[in-house]
Amino acid sequence: MEKNATLLTEFVLTGLSHQPLWNIPLFLVFLVIYLITIVGNVSLITLIWTDPHLHIPMYLFLGSLAFVDTSISSIVVPKMLLNFFGKSKVITLSECMAQFFLFNISATTECFLLAAMAYDRYVAICKPLLYPVVMTNGLCVWLIALSFVAGIIHALIHEGFLLRLTFCNSNMIHNFYCDIISLLKISCTDTSLNYLIVFIFSGSIQVFTISTILVSYTIILFTILKKKSAKGIKKAFSTCGAHLLSVSLYYGPLLFMYVHPASSEVDDQDMIDSLFYTVIIPVLNPIIYSLRNKQVIDSLAKFLKRNV
């Protein structure tokens, strides 16, 4: 680092658009999406919390996923909305680190929750008689807690290695929130160790959770194909379809960000991918899991009947 270099304590989030003309339309679009996200996920959590019939592992996992999706959206979107009308779009170093830390906890937790949900479906479909014994509420709560603990540990590791960095080359973050790759790009400290940590820990989490999901659903697929009952096959596919769609939507952009070559030309693509799993997926998940779920729809009907 140069002796006369000025250490930066504030950054500028470039955001989604450099055209002021687009600020109001984009603000309105993302405000509506955010409100739908909050209402949808909080409603799902409320239904699961208040209806004793939904106090089973499948819905406890779903409620936890809704909580994490709400967190991801709330960590990123409010600041993004403010920046549509902010002249400077500044975020301090401490705010940036806090945002990344909380986002990392939520994103990592979601990975482990999706893997746990895949295991839950595996036991339910492949070992239905043992399901009440194997997948108890106690085990479910333990898996949920473990997912959050893993998220916190993962975030602490990255945060610890980020704190050793200094920033003096540029204060422009080419994104709408503070993500680790954007921060590493503008550091004037050697970031080789940080990239290695990202590769080892984030890569291991992706490999472990995706492998768990793939193995679970491969076994589920073979089990379904062995079923002679058309009704049983339809029910099994209906049960797993929502989760598979959610997994595909979440891991697709995430994996693409890891495999494409690094260059300045892909900054916009990175931003689109980030937008997908920080804004779009949190609003889609409650819709995906609720629209074709009879128990959730019935519970909603009862709730509205009691309270409206």
Curated annotation (Swiss-Prot):
It comes from Mus musculus (Mouse). PROSITE patterns: G_PROTEIN_RECEP_F1_1 (PS00237), G_PROTEIN_RECEP_F1_2 (PS50262). Potential odorant receptor. Glycans are attached at N4. Its main location: membrane. GO terms for cellular component: membrane; plasma membrane. InterPro entries: GPCR_Rhodpsn, GPCR_Rhodpsn_7TM, Olfact_rcpt. Residues 1-27, 77-92, 165-197, 260-270 are extracellular. It is found in: Cell membrane. Belongs to the G-protein coupled receptor 1 family. The chain crosses the membrane at residues 28-48, 56-76, 93-113, 144-164, 198-218, 239-259, 271-291. GO terms for molecular function: G protein-coupled receptor activity; olfactory receptor activity. Disulfide bonds join C96-C188. GO terms for biological process: G protein-coupled receptor signaling pathway; sensory perception of smell. It is a multi-pass membrane protein. The keyword Membrane applies. This is Olfactory receptor 5H19. PANTHER family: OLFACTORY RECEPTOR (PTHR48018). Keywords: Cell membrane, Disulfide bond, G-protein coupled receptor, Glycoprotein, Membrane, Olfaction, Receptor, Sensory transduction, Transducer, Transmembrane, Transmembrane helix. The keyword Disulfide bond applies. Residues 49-55, 114-143, 219-238, 292-308 are cytoplasmic. It holds the Pfam family 7tm_4.
